[in-house]
Amino acid sequence: MSTPFGLDLGNNNSVLAVARNRGIDVVVNEVSNRSTPSLVGFGPRNRYLGESGKTKQTSNVKNTVENLKRIIGLKFKDPEFDIENKFFTSKLVQLKNGKVGVEVEFGGKTHVFSATQLTAMFIDKVKHTVQEETKSSITDVCLAVPVWYSEEQRYNIADAARIAGLNPVRIVNDVTAAAVSYGVFKNDLPGPEEKPRIIGLVDIGHSTYTCSIMAFRKGEMKVLGTAYDKHFGGRDFDRAITEHFADQFKDKYKIDIRKNPKAYNRILIAAEKLKKVLSANTTAPFSVESVMDDIDVSSQLSREELEELVEPLLKRVTYPITNALAQAKLTVNDIDFVEIIGGTTRIPVLKKSISDVFGKPLSSTLNQDEAVAKGAAFICAIHSPTLRVRPFKFEDIDPYSVSYTWDKQVDDEDRLEVFPANSSYPSTKLITLHRTGDFSMKAVYTHPSKLPKGTSTTIAKWSFTGVKVPKDQDFIPVKVKLRCDPSGLHIIENAYTTEDITVQEPVPLPEDAPEDAEPQFKEVTKTIKKDVLGMTAKTFALNPVELNDLIEKENELRNQDKLVAETEDRKNALEEYIYTLRAKLDDEYSDFASDAEKEKLKNMLATTENWLYGDGDDSTKAKYIAKYEELASLGNIIRGRYLAKEEEKRQALRANQETSKMNDIAEKLAEQRRARAASDDSDDNNDENMDLD
């Protein structure tokens, strides 16, 4: 049975959660952290995913890819490319399909990977983290993504999950997942017939700022309005600090970290830590050793100075809140509580700015780092056929209006806005078209100007075949079932022709009609389904051939990583065996090997050690195993003698202990017999004395 898995794919760190044991648990990674760095690194032989990638990032900046969620679906000529490019230390390149790829050095060769591939690598990593921690299979996942993700980006992230061997049961907006956490675990919500509780939920993470206005009742939640600033997050604060020190160090130390990616990245990492320290302290020191040209740098920053540096950002705090309220047709006076999540909301001046806009104190009912992942895990559990979860109904809204267009075959409209902006989903609509033959349809965004820059206006295309128009008619009605599914994807479920038929329906008899009255009928025209049309869809999803090809490539890379890890384990085991066996030959094994055996084994150890640090430094798993077994063939004989002697000693000790124990028991029994005998003699003497009397 698959364990429901919720993934909050963060831009800086990701959080993993599962539904189990009648609750939702956050999964810790291999170093017991409750979040995992969202990055992929590439080395001479293998990949560095998550924690290992973060560890090697400073020395491997050009081959470490961060900001994965920002380049999903991003086109190389997108107006926002330059904004994103400045946050990358790796080289971004243009793929054949016009999207952004990343060029890295891997295994001694230059490789280019798509954003979908890179994201799949990371998802595969965290999938195995969850499997190892839960000791269960993981097949279903609910992925939390930014609200501004377009249809194309949602398809791309779903493909990444499939490449990683997962079934994406739902793509959910991250603030919606957090709201599900709130609604499911909050016990004091209004009842079904009561006025709903209105919550303003503000999420500011590493790269995005989102505000959502939501209505809660017990067992249900509805999103009323959502707005965002997709270029406002913790990384912008980090960069402001880094740029400040870049200018300062240029004057103070005559170095320009902007010309040295490794140095800039080290200052950026230190700036992130400084930002966190200033959330709890009014001032903090700043220092980085040997940042470049063997120069150590040091400085300090106060909270007041930080607030001055980020003043341009703080001026943008108001917009997402006021826009979300406008969508919801509410004012700040209608808001009952303001909940904040996301690591960046810990910055004091930012919290104050949010509170000032709402005119209310802020609440931290939700875990700021884990609420999204827990909500996603609960949503995944809802889709599980084997788990029973607490009933909870929720509706999200699509910020973009979507229309459907079709071939104009009769004198009729050829376009219809089906899902207006901010309409709730999931939702299904049925439309009727008059068709003269086979036709095609498209789903498009109604107002391209309201989309994020660079977003494709076309969502999907469909071709329909099998339209048969009766000879006595000019056209035939076709019913088309349109749907915005739970993941916010606009699809067509089916299409079919209809025809009108005449049927006889009974007419109800008067109440005073005799029992043997003849039943009356009337002719009624009914519309029935006639022919289901053939349908071919063209979406942003990978086709089966492309998907299988990428799955095979990921499997190859995973197996390669596994082989490298196992090879390193065998190498370390061989090295440890050499040191351990050499030490024991002069110690506990000394009396159990002849001089000839010692000399032979020591020579073997020396030869193997020289090989290990020479030609064998980069050898194969099989070779390390063979070398280990070669040493063990003699070492185990000596070890066996030692263990046999130790066992003999243990047996002798155990026998002595048993003998001593039996002697103690015998002595105690003898003592008891002597005591009873003495007691009997005393009684006999007393009897004799009584006779004399």
From Swiss-Prot:
GO biological process, one term: proteasome-mediated ubiquitin-dependent protein catabolic process
Induction text: By upshift to 37 degrees Celsius.
GO cellular component labels: cytoplasm; cytosol; nucleus
Amino acid composition bias (Basic and acidic residues), ranges on this chain: 664-679
UniProt keyword list: ATP-binding, Calmodulin-binding, Nucleotide-binding, Stress response
Pfam families: HSP70
Family affiliation: Belongs to the heat shock protein 70 family.
Protein name per UniProt: Heat shock protein homolog SSE2
Organism whose genome encodes this protein: Saccharomyces cerevisiae (strain ATCC 204508 / S288c) (Baker's yeast)
Name of the coding gene: SSE2
